Amino acid sequence: MENQKMPISSVSNLKDLNMISRPVANFPPSIWGDRFINYACEDENDQAQKEKQVEELKELVRRELAITVDKPLQQLNIIDATQRLGIAYLFENEIEESLEHIYLHTYVENTCFEGSDDLYSVALWFRLLRQNDYRVSCDVFNKFRDNEGNFKNNLMEDTKGLLELYEATHLSVHGEEMLDDALEFTKTRLESVVSHLNYPLAEQVRHALYQPLHKGLPRLEAVYFFRIYEAHASHNKALLKLAKLDFNLLQSFHKKELSDIARWWKSLDFAAKFPFARDRLVEGYFWVLGVYFEPQYSLARKIIIKVFTMISTIDDIYDAYGTLDELELFTKAMQRWDVGSLDQLPEYMKPCYKSILDVYNEIEVEMDNQGSLFRMHYAKEVMKKLVEGYMDEAKWCHEKYVPTFQEYMSVALVTSGYTFLTTISYLGMGEIASKEAFDWLFSHPPVIEASESVGRLMDDTRSHKFEQERGHVASGIECYMKQYGVTEEEARDEFRKRLVKAWKDINEECLRPYRVPKPLLMRILNLTRVIDVIYKNEDGYTHVKKAMKDNIASLLIDPMIV
């Protein structure tokens, strides 16, 4: 990180200095400009026609889900296609009833079904029930292992079955060594055969090895699956058409939403006021779409994206610009949460602090209208705690202090921002986000710690080199290396093991019976998925390269051809 001299006019209370040395990170600018500010509304007649088609097709699909009730395998395949095409949210009740029926008859009553001796069918059955939070045992795969516990050799040629088993293994919980073995077995075999397969199976295998379904963003996975599903001659034409129409309607809805937010963001002029900070509104909105894309969560998205942009700027003030004295002032102002604190801040900090108060006041009015004013207490407290964590890291950086790994993680889990983002994600979710739900969240349950761990460990793993080059606070990799006297690669291996553990914790916490309503758990799962996607190979939020550009284009630029 470069130390650059900045004019004293940008700060206050330091009149005895002419220039201040600042640790500027030189983040790349936004690549989008004003692209998403203007939104051309679709012709109302065309829109109405598409909506009518969607309603008609929904009835067709609804009937098909009901018709297959006594054919579990056929029903599982329709449910799988519905979910992978991104339209399961349209049929939540029907899918829940179908899976409940299948669970009771094939698992509780142990009734055999067509395909119950076939690896693909059993793995699909297991994955869909686990994916929908049913506690089914992995012992169902014992029939595919020999007396020594190894998977049978005759499975080696069943690529379709191996692929389905591979996807199922990512839903494992602690104590399921069989699924750990299955993951290693299927991954090794699929990697060895992928270059010899034909389309579309080759593409399915290649994609799954890169992005397992369970850890992917449902809407992004749907974009990929459209062409795979269409390539199968036996695909359900009504289902595919419905999925494409719904995708395009939702994309228009999201583009309008982003256009409104982009105009608000431009009116703040943060790009000019905070040129040292990351200008990542579009990337932030993509992040939020990963948390919830459904139309009923429009208010929730508008709330979280505004807060998201604020906290991204605050992060960079602490991380890449502010002096320790200035950051102390800002931290104290955040604890007071009072517009009167503006006068005590350096000039450049004032627009950010004022905007935070304004955004929270706007949210408070909405919460008051809903009779949910109690939520603001949690929203403010989690912000204060996050800023305190940023301050701790700033002190470490200033003192060139390398904490123990345990000390580092006690702060770094907070500054991962995932308890913060989960709290904010609940604000616009309606009555389901009760006081009891917020109290549960603030008790720091295992699923939250696991989500924070994924966020922190993946961030540290992907951004370690860049952060160290710019003189950032010691990363988890660096802390672990120093404390345990290991190499960087050994530290990375340990992080990979911890990521596996964290995902198992998340999978376990999402199984029935739920501690809080499922939609609230889904926010945590989806936030964790976002990290897996954006930080797959690098910090795609800070350094927006081809993968991130393509993902954003898929959801917010390119429509489906119906």
UniProtKB/Swiss-Prot annotation:
Pfam families: Terpene_synth (PF01397), Terpene_synth_C (PF03936). One of its GO terms (biological process) is diterpenoid biosynthetic process. Binds 3 Mg(2+) or Mn(2+) ions per subunit. Mg(2+) 2 binds at residues 315, 319. Its cofactor is Mg(2+); Mn(2+). InterPro entries: Isoprenoid_synthase_dom_sf, Terpene_cyclase-like_1_C, Terpene_cyclase_plant_C1, Terpene_synth_N, Terpene_synth_N_sf, Terpene_synthase-like, Terpene_synthase_metal-bd, Terpenoid_cyclase/PrenylTrfase. Keywords: Lyase, Magnesium, Manganese, Metal-binding. A motif (DDXXD motif) lies at residues 315-319. Mg(2+) 3 binds at residue 467. Gene3D superfamilies: Farnesyl Diphosphate Synthase, Terpene synthase, N-terminal domain. GO terms for molecular function: magnesium ion binding; terpene synthase activity. Belongs to the terpene synthase family. Tpsa subfamily. Sesquiterpene synthase. This is Probable sesquiterpene synthase. It comes from Santalum austrocaledonicum.
